[in-house]
């Protein structure tokens, strides 16, 4: 079978600019396209799309965007971005690894509201139609997490009608998701164990 070169189209990378610790997509059509796919946030005053660091890393790794440093005019690769982002967020690698996994599983993940919640995650196919179903907290295996902190995140999730998931990254980089729910411990009945 012979393939006609005229029918093979190479997707052009979307141009993005790194400026003051953030990545912005200035072209409105490209910004809207990414936004519709669940990436970034649109700045209403300028119609620019601002990508979160983990989104910029993911899109750079997937060769969807090409990032240029506004000051030096040099093209930034994945490694260059990770170095710049790690200055402002020591947990950027953890967030990126979990974000990449969620996207690979077909979920849209947005930045969490804070207080330890890393991501708001939508059910597959529900982005733009329904509210996020899950709150995800990312951590490495063996990391100590205070129970009070987990309890606060669980309360916030339940108050919002969402499910809290812990994304635990093991030493091989594999991720296991655990669902947290409230457990009521009761005293045993009189004649039971």
Predicted region positions:
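Beta-rich nucleic-acid/ligand-interaction surfaces
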Residues: 115-124
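Short, well-structured beta-strand/strand-turn elements
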Residues: 104-116
